[in-house]
Design a protein with these regions (language model features):
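Short Gly/Thr/Asp-enriched flexible loops that form oxyanion-binding sites at enzyme active sites
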Residues: 82-104, 242-249
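Accessory alpha-helical/coil subdomains and C-terminal extensions
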Residues: 7-8, 34-35, 151-237, 242-243
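ATP/NTP phosphate-donor binding region
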Residues: 1-71, 249, 269
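Conserved small/polar residues in nucleotide/adenosyl-binding loops
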Residues: 329-335
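Catalytic-core regions built around general acid/base machinery
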Residues: 68, 245-258
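Interaction/scaffold regions that mediate signaling and macromolecular assembly across diverse proteins
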Residues: 277-285, 290-305
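Short, acidic/small-residue loops that bind anionic groups at enzyme active sites
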Residues: 94-121, 134-136, 255-265
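Internal gly/pro-rich beta-alpha loop/helix module
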Residues: 108-178
Length: 335
């Protein structure tokens, strides 16, 4: 019988009603006991790593999760992390970079309604996550939610209330799960233990700046003492304003100082390409300015934190950013 380590971190799935609103209160053991049948399928060990609202998730807690999985990697056949939905996509992306090419599945799941709610989606999500983690063809980091298995670098929370909370952005779902069956769309890549690569260091000095009409160029100066990289969410396919030269100067001052700028789009689907319009093309050749293609913002945040945790050399940052960490899960961007 396979062994699964279930890591509980809190979130809606573990929450109970209080006078101050929903608050994580159920333990991992209580959550596991709430889903009949899962302990008949495998040996489950529950670890209560934390019990927080995922709004309070931080990079240091990603490191704690990653280090915990690595410490117990040889003792289990798979890992299931119970996590709040609000920052699950960030955590899934971060773990994808901290634990690369894992031959063992690392599955994140949660719910839109607490386990104790009579209409909860928690039981089916946890049950299907265990099923997916037990399957011989499962590997790497995935989000399993509402019958879908989504690559860790492609998940995004798209809905705040409905059970279909997560979508796979700019890449197909890896599998559908229904009636105890897994319908896979990808079967050709199964890494071995020799492929496994693990990391610890992260640099959390990464900021997401969303462009709005008339945004002030001074923002770069204000951020310079606190951050090493900015992710610029541009207009459309990669448009950066040029109503005067202040914004252009601020961007080049930023990257010429050795800092990093990654360009993405505010539009959820189909990605960015700065070379299409004049308002973006002038920035495309600088080694400190990176194009994120169709990566999610959550994945860009995690990837830059991981890269900057390994190096501060601008050329090496560029090389690592465009290096694909998982060939299966990419379309035109180097996840």
């Amino acid at each position: 019988m396979k062994k699964i380590l279930m890591i509980a971190t809190g979130g809606t799935i573990a929450s109970k009603e209080t006078e101050n609103g929903l608050t994580p209160a159920m333990t991992g053991e209580e959550l596991a006991a709430s889903v009949p049948g899962i302990k008949d399928k495998c040996e489950i060990t529950v670890m209560q790593l934390m019990n927080i609202d995922s709004t309070n998730m931080r990079p240091r807690l990603w490191q704690l999760m990653s280090d915990t999985i690595i410490e117990h990697y040889n003792d289990y056949d798979g890992f299931v992390i119970l996590h709040g939905t609000d920052t699950m996509a960030y955590t899934a992306a971060a773990l994808s970079y901290l634990i690369q090419d894992s031959p063992k599945p690392i599955v994140l799941t949660g719910s839109q309604k607490p386990m104790g709610n009579p209409y909860t989606d928690a039981k089916i999500n946890l049950y299907q996550s265990i099923l997916y983690a037990l399957d011989d063809h499962s590997c790497d980091v995935t989000v399993v939610f509402n019958g879908k298995a989504i690559a860790g670098t492609r998940a995004r929370k798209q809905r705040t209330r409905s059970f279909a909370a997560f979508e796979s952005m700019n890449f197909p779902v890896l599998a559908l799960i229904h009636d105890d069956k897994i319908l896979r769309y990808f079967r050709d890549r199964e890494p071995s233990m020799d492929d496994l690569k693990t990391y610890h260091n992260l640099n959390d000095r990464v900021f997401v700046l969303k462009l709005t009409p008339e945004v002030k160029a001074d923002i770069f100066h204000l951020l310079s003492s606190h951050y090493d990289a900015i992710i610029l969410e541009t207009f459309g396919i990669g448009g950066i304003p040029e109503y005067d030269d202040s914004f252009e100067k601020a961007i080049f001052d930023w990257v010429n100082s050795g800092k990093t700028l990654a360009v993405t789009t505010q539009v959820p689907e189909e990605g960015c390409d700065m070379e299409v319009y004049k308002v973006g093309k002038k920035y495309s050749e600088h080694p400190g300015i990176l194009q994120a293609g169709d990566m999610t913002t959550e994945s860009i945040v995690a990837k830059l934190m991981w890269i900057l945790g390994q190096t501060n050399d601008q050329k090496e940052i560029r090389k690592m950013f465009y290096q694909t960490i998982c060939l299966l899960y990419t379309s035109d961007a180097a996840d």
